[in-house]
Structures are given as C-alpha cells and as structure tokens.
Swiss-Prot record:
It comes from Streptococcus sanguinis (strain SK36). It catalyses: N-acetyl-L-glutamate + ATP = N-acetyl-L-glutamyl 5-phosphate + ADP. The record marks K8, K215 as: Transition state stabilizer. Belongs to the acetylglutamate kinase family. ArgB subfamily. This is Acetylglutamate kinase. Its EC number is 2.7.2.8. Its main location: cytoplasm. One of its GO terms (cellular component) is cytoplasm. Keywords: Amino-acid biosynthesis, Arginine biosynthesis, ATP-binding, Cytoplasm, Kinase, Nucleotide-binding, Transferase. The gene is argB. It comes from the Bacteria. GO terms for molecular function: acetylglutamate kinase activity; ATP binding.
Length: 245
C-alpha cells in the first residue's frame, strides 16, 4: 500500500513516546500517510522475569522462550507495553487500536527451532485484511511481537522480524526500526548507509553483532521484498539507511 509507514518501537522508546515522535507521527498523518506500529517490550519482560527470579537467555540475538514464560511475555507486551503505547497515541489525537483478539489471526507463525529457542516463532504469513481495514479507516494498528501457529499456540516473535514481515506484506513505502542507539556504528560513528552486499562482511568482522543482527537481517529481507526504504536509528528521521546494492 502506497503511503504506508511501518514503525517498530523497541527499547526505551517502547516505554515512553517522546514529544518529537508524536509530533512527527501527527505530521505524517496530516500529510496522508498511514502508519502501523509494531512493538517489542524486552525491558519490561526482563523486569518481570527478574521479579519472578527466572533466567533470561538469548541465542543469536533472539530470546529463548519456555512455554511457562509465555504468560509473562503476554502480560508484558499486551497488558503493559502495547496498552500504554496505544493510550499515549490516542491521548495525542492519533486514533489507534491495539490488536489483541485479532493478533493471532493476523500474524501466522511457526517454530524457528523449538529445541534451540523454545516457543519462538518466525512469521509464515501476515493476513493483511484487518490491518487494511483499520488503515482505510485512518486508524493506527498497534501490534505486539506475538503470533500463533496452526495449532493456535502463542509464539514469541522478534519485533524486528515481525515489522519487516508487516512492511513487506503491505508493500509499505518505508520501514523504521527504532532502537536505543543512533544506527549501525563502526568505530563509534553512525554509518549513514549500508548496502545489502556489505552486510555479511560486517557481521563476520563484528561490526554488526548481538541484537543488531536480527535488525539488519530483517532490514535486508524488507528491502529485497520491494519496500522502498528501511531506516535503523533512535528516532524517526535519522540513522542508518539500508539500501539494495
């Protein structure tokens, strides 16, 4: 869909939207842009796990998720982060709707590797009908990084991968992956642009590592799927632009 911008919010930004963020969204909406928000909630999940004295473990930047962790993750993402984000947007006259009952019908997923990651999913399909219905009504859909498999089991999904899948399925004009750092850093400086052909070497040399790996991988997939622009940064306008080449 032309004029669609998909924004993934993570890190500190997922806990409190800045005035600058709100203003930019308002400007885009006034200019006729349609926006989808996808969010994670790692900080809140970590806090809830810590309170329950449960371990947090990551493999290749992805959170290992036991079945018993799912109620905690669901509480963090749907009950806290998503609800707060939606409320903040609505309070700023940005009409928004948090997907709860429709989420599992919209985000279809399957296990990545149950033995290695547990209840962590990869997106198999995005059913866009309900999202398009909301966008046509000038509403902002707010999606937590969760999905369901064919058996109706809840799966934890990396928010960067989910945002990429949503952007690709809607053929958005832009995907923005917001994080706590200014962009992809090399020698403590932000790289203004990264070509898809440079990515594997940057991972091999350790320039791209940890939680930045799924961001970059999802950015590359999105660019190659036909989405015009993918930006990684700590705001909506500047950072590292991922381009095909």
């Amino acid at each position: 869909m032309k004029d669609v911008i998909v924004i993934k919010i993570g890190g500190v930004a997922a806990q409190k939207l800045s005035d600058k963020f709100i203003k930019q969204m308002q400007e885009w909406i006034a200019a006729g842009k349609k926006i989808v928000v996808v969010h994670g909630g790692g900080l809140v999940i970590n806090q809830l796990m810590k309170e329950r004295q449960l371990p947090t473990r990551k493999v290749k930047g992805l959170r290992v998720t036991a079945k018993s962790d799912l109620p905690i993750i669901e509480q963090a993402l749907l009950g806290q982060v998503g609800r707060t984000l939606t409320q903040e947007l609505n309070d700023s006259d940005i009409e928004s709707l948090q997907l709860v009952s429709h989420l599992g019908k919209t985000v279809l997923a399957d296990f990545i590797d149950k033995d290695l990651y547990g209840y962590v999913g990869q997106v198999t399909a995005i059913q866009t009908a309900y999202l398009e219905q909301l966008l046509d009504a000038d509403m902002v859909p707010v999606l937590a990084s969760l999905g369901e498999n064919a058996a109706g089991e809840l799966l934890n999904i990396n928010a960067d991968y989910l945002a990429a899948a949503v952007a690709s399925s809607l053929q958005a004009e832009k995907l923005i992956l917001m994080t706590d750092i200014e962009g992809v850093l090399e020698d403590k400086k932000v790289l203004p642009q990264l070509l898809t052909s440079q990515i594997s070497k940057k991972i091999q040399t350790g320039v791209i590592k940890g939680g930045m790996i799924p961001k970059i991988e999802s950015a590359v997939q999105t660019v190659l799927s036909g989405v015009g622009q993918v930006l990684i940064g700590d705001n909506l306008l500047t950072g590292t632009l991922i381009a095909e080449g």
